[in-house]
From Swiss-Prot:
Catalytic activity: uroporphyrinogen III + 4 H(+) = coproporphyrinogen III + 4 CO2
EC number: 4.1.1.37
Location in the cell: Cytoplasm
Entries under InterPro entries matching the protein: UROD/MetE-like_sf, Uroporphyrinogen_deCO2ase_HemE, Uroporphyrinogen_deCOase
Protein family (similarity comment): Belongs to the uroporphyrinogen decarboxylase family.
SUPFAM superfamilies hit by this protein: UROD/MetE-like
Keywords assigned by UniProt, alphabetized: Cytoplasm, Decarboxylase, Lyase, Porphyrin biosynthesis
The name this protein goes by in its record: Uroporphyrinogen decarboxylase
Pathway of action: Porphyrin-containing compound metabolism; protoporphyrin-IX biosynthesis; coproporphyrinogen-III from 5-aminolevulinate: step 4/4
Record-marked site positions (Transition state stabilizer): D77
Disulfide links within the chain: none
Natural source organism: Legionella pneumophila (strain Lens)
């Protein structure tokens, strides 16, 4: 039987030697694929798709059938936890995620219940079990969650925001309530990731999409401290399950992030991979960081930019190739194939 620990992805995460650089793509199951759009149409809406384990399994497997990827990522949404807390998640056409019951005052934070994660989010774990059963045995499955700070941003703002005025006001004027909210979310995220691990995921990733809007001190206090807590708890219970942290626009804080005990850091395209490796490569693996916009260009441009990312990281292990953020819906599927082939062709020279 194939030992999953021998997979390229898990070996690179642990900074063990690999024959070539592994690759997967954030949002690899997504709207750029015509087969995904068909299933989503059948589901009726995005949330129905997330909450139906069979359909979530199908869309998770779609990119694996099409491309030679080195990992699958569980199909779900980062806002399942706030939805389970009773905030009423829905997706408005062209507006992204919204909540019918956002947290409008500190009273709402105090009365916010921590849900029973195994029961309220059973559809996620059912999907994970089904995916693990149906997907190629030699490929790892990645589980994920939003970070407490990122979830809090959506919950207080009522959806995505341009300026995050309400949540920033909260951390400056109602620190205690902000920390209470983040503590409740950290407990829920920890429980959520543990249940995903029990359901069969082989690595987990924490998406801190909005950590980059904070000042350095506020990032430490209101985002990183809670991710640190989660990593420590996960490592205590599951020391062999790798944890990846990703803060968008967080390139200036890599050293702090590497101190959490995580195994790898996701880096976006604004961060120089060579200097990131110099700074933290002795402690953690790095994942990234092709600019997603490159996938809207030409074959030659894609191959050249893939080569630049690989050269920037340089020789040796500890690099997982990915985009610097999620793939966009307008990317031609054939351009994804060009990127993957380029990684397969160019990266072996860095692992001789």
């Amino acid at each position: 039987m194939f030992d999953l620990n021998q997979s390229l992805f898990l070996r690179a995460l642990r900074r063990q030697p690999v024959e070539r650089t592994p690759i997967w793509i954030m949002r690899q199951a997504g709207r750029y694929l015509p087969e995904y759009r068909k299933v989503r149409e059948y589901a009726g809406d995005f949330l129905n798709l997330c909450k139906n384990p069979e359909l979530a399994c199908e869309v998770t497997l779609q990119p694996l059938r099409r491309y030679a990827l080195d990992a699958a990522i569980l199909f779900s949404d980062i806002l399942t936890i706030p939805d389970a807390m009773g905030l009423g998640l829905y997706f408005a056409e062209g507006e992204g995620p919204r909540f019918t019951n956002p947290l409008q005052d500190t009273k709402a934070i105090h009365t916010l219940k921590i849900p029973s994660i195994p029961e309220s989010l059973s559809y996620v774990f059912d999907a994970a079990r089904l995916i693990r059963q149906e997907m190629p045995k030699e490929l790892p499955l990645i589980g994920f969650s939003g970070s407490p700070w990122t979830l809090a941003c959506y919950m207080v703002e009522g959806g995505s925001s341009r300026d995050f005025k309400r949540i920033l006001n909260l951390i400056y004027t109602e620190k205690e309530a902000a920390h209470l909210l983040l503590s409740k979310l950290a407990a829920s995220v920890t429980a959520y990731l543990i249940e995903q691990i029990k359901a069969g995921v082989n690595a987990v990733m924490i998406f801190d999409t909005w950590g980059g809007v904070l000042t350095p001190q506020n990032y430490k206090d209101f985002s990183l401290a809670y991710m640190h807590q989660i990593v420590q708890q996960l490592k205590k219970e599951y020391p062999d399950i790798p944890v990846i942290l990703f803060t968008k626009n967080g390139g200036q804080w890599l050293e702090w992030m590497a101190e959490t005990g995580c195994d790898a850091l996701g880096v976006d395209w604004t961060c120089d991979l060579a200097s990131a490796r110099k700074r933290v490569g002795g402690k953690v693996a790095l994942q990234g960081n092709l600019d997603p916009a490159v996938l809207l260009t030409t074959k030659n441009c894609i191959r050249s930019e893939v080569g630049s990312v690989l050269a920037s990281y340089g020789y040796g292990t500890g690099h997982i190739f990915n985009l610097g953020h999620g793939i966009t819906p307008d990317v031609p599927p054939e351009n994804v194939a060009i990127m993957i082939e380029a990684v397969h062709e160019i990266s072996p020279q860095y692992h001789l």
